[in-house]
Design a protein with these regions (language model features):
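Short alpha-helical donor nucleotide-sugar binding micro-motif in glycosyltransferases
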Residues: 88-94
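Aromatic "clamp/platform" in nucleotide-sugar-dependent glycosyltransferases that forms part
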Residues: 101-103
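Short hydrophobic beta-strand element within catalytic cores of glycosyltransferases
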Residues: 119-125
Length: 188
């Protein structure tokens, strides 16, 4: 068995060490645009509780830029949807991503974020992580409450290593269950 870690694995481990929230954090908000169903305004408002935080938003609308400027929030952005590879590169630069929408039943974005080693908050409109302590960490029950989103961000960042460990455990269990079900289906 090879115990040598790649440079990428070492970088992920270093980034995932517990970070002091007071140092400012990088928060990603992606694929939300300005549609109300995507809940972008509440997610942005939740970030104002973190001094010196910076948000990365893709795509961004003129209205969202105005909102960010009114709230005096530091941000980076791209005005349009971008290729997946470029989005993945942006995702991994953050301490946490938020995807607390009102409408998603099985969004890919949270899985993509976790796969890049970055925890992602979700809304309570899906069945991700049910039966796992991970759901208690990352699922926002009241999507329209910026204080709950803020509290979840704090809790996840304070327990980032455990959250990522729980994700890996959940993923392993999920993959095993899928293999079992596919086998049962194929064997009739």
């Amino acid at each position: 068995m090879n115990n040598v870690k790649s440079k990428e694995e070492n970088e992920k481990e270093e980034k995932n060490k517990t970070k002091n929230i007071e140092d400012g954090i990088s928060i990603g908000i992606y694929n939300a645009h300005s549609r109300e169903l995507k809940n972008i305004y509440t997610q942005i408002l939740a970030t104002t509780f973190f001094k010196d935080s910076k948000i990365d938003i893709v795509p961004i609308s003129k209205e969202i830029k105005e909102y960010l400027n009114i709230l005096d929030i530091e941000y980076t952005c791209i005005d349009k949807f971008i290729p997946t590879e470029e989005l993945m590169n942006r995702i991994k630069r953050n301490d946490i991503n938020v995807y607390v929408t009102f409408t998603e039943c099985s969004p890919m974005f949270p899985m993509e974020s976790f796969e890049e080693g970055v925890p992602c908050l979700i809304g309570n409109n899906n069945d991700y992580f049910i039966g796992s302590k991970l759901r208690e960490y990352v699922c926002v029950d009241r999507e329209d409450d910026p204080r709950e989103i803020r509290d979840k961000i704090k809790i996840v960042l304070e327990n980032k290593e455990e959250v990522l460990k729980l994700y890996r455990e959940w993923k392993n269990n999920f993959n095993n269950e899928v293999k079992k079900q596919v086998k049962e289906f194929l064997e009739g």
